[in-house]
Amino acid sequence: MEQLPGAAVEGSDSYSRNLLARVSGDRRFLYNDANATHGAGPFAVLKGLMKLSTLRHYLTWKRLRLIGLALLLLLAGFTLYLDFRVRDAFEGRRFALPARLYARPLELFPGLKLTPDALIQELARLGYKEPLTGDEPGRFARHGNSFEIVARPFVFWDGAQPARKLHLDFRGDSLSGVHDLQSDRPLTLARLDPLYIGGIYPAHNEDRLLVRLEEVPEQLVQALIAIEDRKFYKHHGIHLRGMARATVATATGRGVQGGSTLTQQLVKNFFLSPERTLRRKATEILMALLVELHYDKRDILETYLNEIYLGQDGNRAIHGVGLASQFYFGKPLKELTLPESALLVGMVKGPGYYDPRRHPERARERRDLVLAEMAKLEMLLPAQLAAARSAPLDVIEKPSMGTTPYPAFLDLVRRQLRRDYHEDDLRSEGLHIFTTLDPVVQTSAEQALTKRLAQIERARKGVTGLEGAVVVTNVQNGEVQAVVGGRDAHFEGFNRALDAHRPVGSLLKPVTYLSALMHPERYTLATLLDDSPLVWKERGIPDWQPENYDKTFHGQVPLRLALAHSYNVASARLGLELGLNEVLDNARRLGVERELPPYAASLLGAVELAPLEVTQMYQTIASGGFRVPLRAIREVLTAAGQPVQRYTLAVEQVFEAAPVYLLTSALQDVVSEGTAVGLKEFLPPPLKLAGKTGTTDELRDSWFAGFSGDRLAVVWVGYDDNRPAGLTGASGALPVWGELMRMLDPEPLAPPLPEDVERVWIDTASGLRADRDCAGAIELPFVRGSAPEESAPCASSPVKKLKGWFRRLFE
């Protein structure tokens, strides 16, 4: 045998010494004699080692026992650490649950203004389907003007509502009767489950809807066991044969493949990183054993079903079978069919690869494989297998956004929530938040804005890129029913309804007129205002000379017509007579919280407000002088359904009823004969709607704010870069408002007459009293004692004279 230079010969004492040096780490034992004897076998080596007293010194049984004990202590410590992690996770809050937000529930009661077609749209939005099959929740049937609906169970703020089988009768455009078919008695009120509109998610953007094991269909559990872990109920967390296969695969560089039990999968997803190493696999095995040691199979299975990843919706991760059922099938987990359950279980292996929307054939093959495995285990009869395999995938269309279809509204909700809750609580405590959003109103607002802006751009060739915003509220209680933050209502970016602060123009004029009408001894709707040239001088700034939009002056103008036609000069002179401070103070009382600049130009709207701020101001007018803070939230419940906070109605009367009633009458004149007369193209005059147009310098901003008997809406139209839009309030925002209200079928505006207000016939030209049969006479409201006492000469028209004769004849 050829000896390498400097090498110790195997079998020699030098070989033993070198081996000892490597074992002990002591270089004193190194031996490197090139002339050493060689040729001895392994027995000689062993003999040499045994003879070395130094080796016996370094490697005694006592030392080996100490090393073993140290390793056992390390393993025990590591096991205790893992045990702490397992118990802490399972016995504490297992999941960071997002806050879940819901729209208003549809409340059904006799007399409700609702058409059968509108009800069908509502049911479709909620995922209810035809035909009716027994008492299965989420189903309905229509029989002419009658409906049978099995309403889903739901936990509301005032308690849990069980599943209910309802019978509804319609008469015309309203609901005439509501009956509970199970108890065979009429109901005064029934609710449908509310529409889920979005969530406030944890930082990792995981979303899930927790379910209890008893809420999971048995066939889904069977499918999971059949395809993922047949011995789940027999093993103690690991499957030795599968584990051996996985270990060999990892050791040979083929990665960890198969062999994982459901418990191991849960541990891997719940605690560990996705790396594929033996160290991680060993940790996974140890933790799986600990989980099985402390918790029963039902608890493990329930946690698994809530944890498993089942898809992606934009930046939102879909976790758990509860949310996956809603995401893929649009219905609660309890309502899943056998093939739907098998499809979900099949996706566990690879939610992206088996995505039924992107890869329907793969998903179908995987589903059928799951069904076949169930049949092998005699979980299905042959007929059940055949029927399930022939069923379509029946997956709903994917939502257009990853978080919510109503981002602008949810932006408002989040801002209001942050006044009362910490961000971490909103992202992890699983709060149930009931909002004021009305999906019908929201959809109508979005469609109206999109439709009318497109029409404006088509009519004005070369004009593109117009933007807009809409806010709609309930007149009576200030609940925000819709918020549209831009032309693309689903864009989760700049929210113009809340953050676009633009000059409001003539929308601020009603504040001046309200201020005047608060002094009935000086101003009434019939008072003549001076609309002649005005020069206002203030120290330190250039003279201010307001002009009217039509570039003309109109002399003596009745107060109500000065507002109806939005005359700038008459309005500015009126505001200056009252005093700038009084007008701006009343703006604050109406609800404008922003500091307004104390300049004369502010009287004509040289003030920047967001559409939501304008809405708050007009809300106080529409509610008769009662300031009602706008609210987007009704109730907040814990994840367990316990009340946390109720957002009660806060009302403060900030103006007497009489001047607000008079102002409302003047705003109705804006619609009937003023700058908003164009609304007649959209809505019938008998509705007596009230509103105000707003136009800013160089036609940069187009505004309209108006209200009916039940709703208030504010619309802004313009460009984001503040360039001129070439639109007045009447040509831009008003058509959007009119289209919206036409879709919503508003109630007439008929505010009650205050006790201290009377109606008097007035001559429009002079502002003096007149007989109602006189030409040019109009009936106006006055605070009692403020109407003019002097009468104008009556120039009776033949028509009015004849009508008066007939009236006196039959009185």
Label the predicted regions.
Residues 233-243, 318-321, 381-385, 491-494, ...:
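Short, well-structured active-site flanking segments
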